[in-house]
């Protein structure tokens, strides 16, 4: 999965915010049917990855940027380990973030000829454990207690059929990221279902 946190802003002040759709689009463009992410073993090769689910966090239309966007990428393996996949995904997310920031800065320089402001976003790409650790270091036991309570509610919602595994996963990421400083961030990871290698 990939989760992108942006910075909320009105569409009329788009350069004051960070649109997660922009970054997620770059990540999708670099991963969708990318043969470098396909796996091979002997004379077999998997089909390349494809995105199966994606949405922003808005529950209704308004004229603000979405605060976050997330999606699920299907990756088939023959020999790659989860670690192999995550390392490749981390690099793509980092490269995508750098490219989007570079493009934004160029456009912002043109815009800033008319406005005296600066853009200071930095690349921040972490796995779920990275944001969990950051939140735990910032808020300690109060975070851990709230996390356990949230996890319990998500498990109950999933068990009752009120939540899908996707909904529960992204709600948990959204919950944890709410505890860390609000800045553009990409969170990546694996989530069920995880199947054995294809044959």
Where does each model-flagged region fall?
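Midchain, well-structured core segments that form catalytic/ion-binding scaffolds
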Residues: 1-147, 151-154
């Amino acid at each position: 999965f990939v989760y992108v946190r942006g910075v909320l802003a009105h569409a009329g002040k788009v350069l004051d915010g960070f649109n997660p759709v922009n970054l997620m689009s770059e990540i999708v463009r670099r991963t969708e049917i990318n043969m470098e992410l396909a796996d091979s073993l002997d004379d077999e090769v998997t089909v390349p990855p494809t995105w199966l689910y994606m949405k922003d966090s808005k529950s209704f239309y308004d004229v603000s940027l979405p605060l976050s966007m997330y999606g699920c990428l299907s990756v088939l393996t023959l020999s790659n380990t989860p670690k192999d996949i995550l390392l490749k995904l981390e690099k793509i997310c980092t490269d995508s973030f750098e490219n989007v920031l570079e493009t934004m800065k160029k456009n912002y320089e043109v815009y800033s000829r008319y406005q005296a402001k600066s853009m200071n976003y930095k690349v921040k790409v972490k796995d779920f454990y990275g944001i969990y650790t950051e939140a735990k270091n910032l808020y300690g036991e109060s975070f851990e207690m709230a996390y356990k309570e949230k996890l319990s509610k998500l498990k109950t919602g999933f068990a009752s059929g009120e939540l899908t595994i996707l909904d529960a996963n992204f709600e948990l990421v959204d919950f944890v990221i709410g505890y860390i400083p609000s800045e553009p961030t990409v969170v990546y990871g694996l989530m069920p279902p995880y199947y054995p290698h294809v044959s």
